[in-house]
Amino acid sequence: MRWLKPKASDAKKLAIDPPEPRAGRHGIAIAACVKNEARYIEEWVRFHQAVGIRHFYIYDNGSVDETRIILRSLLNEDALTIIPWAGRMRDAATSAMLNGQVITFAHAILNFGGDYRWMAFIDVDEFLLPKEAATVEQALDAVGDFPNVSLPWHMFATSGHETPPDGPLTLNYTMRGADPMTTKESVSNFKCIVDPCEVTEVSVHQFQTRAYGDLTANDAGKRFTRRARKSPEFYSNRFLQLNHYYTKSRQELMEKLARGWAYDSNATKYRDKVLSVVKSIEEDMVDDRSMIDFIERNHIDLGR
């Protein structure tokens, strides 16, 4: 009967049994999906190495540029795992597109999570910026033993660059949307850092854990429900800030629109969404130089 048909949204989350913690588990790993990121991935890796990331699990969606070569030149086997992960999948019963990122994140937790105290699930245009400490793990001391941390996007657009400027991405783009908790559609969202050995439900932007269900904490350790984290009261960037370099230059934005998104089959819908997000960001911006200050203070070599 039609009313029993699963909703398309069911393809966007997965229930799992948490992995068992392995002896000596420690540190933070990042799991990320990539495709043809050769232009900027060196900077992303160098920065996150500098802030204490122990291992990178890279799910490669069919890159044809030098992404893999660059990664292997920067990281040894103790710090890098590349998993080929090309293609799209649909639910056979409903024809709903399965979210490839959700599947990779669940795979990362189940196969590798037992080795780590924390796993972060971000994209390669997103940077985890400690605000007071030198490393991400030190910044997470503020949440204590709580297993589910949500970091709001701080959305950066073109910063007036028509073409790609010389030098590091993180030093060239400083203009971001003023309100990370805006209610404008698709401009506000979260990425998560979790204790993988407690996760029971996986999605791109939210997780559930065994002891706390859908409760999640901000970077200061203040706990909210999944729905309530969208309230202004949830906002904090005192200890850890997630910078999302959404467009880069205007030229790169146009290239992004021409490529489409690997996990969205509707090119027109994707283009309209991206342009709407950019417009919303650029309507109200602030100059945020906290990344530059951190890089200079800690003498981080970004390789560009």
Predicted segments with their positions:
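Short beta-strand/loop segment that forms part of the nucleotide-sugar
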Residues: 54-62, 83-86
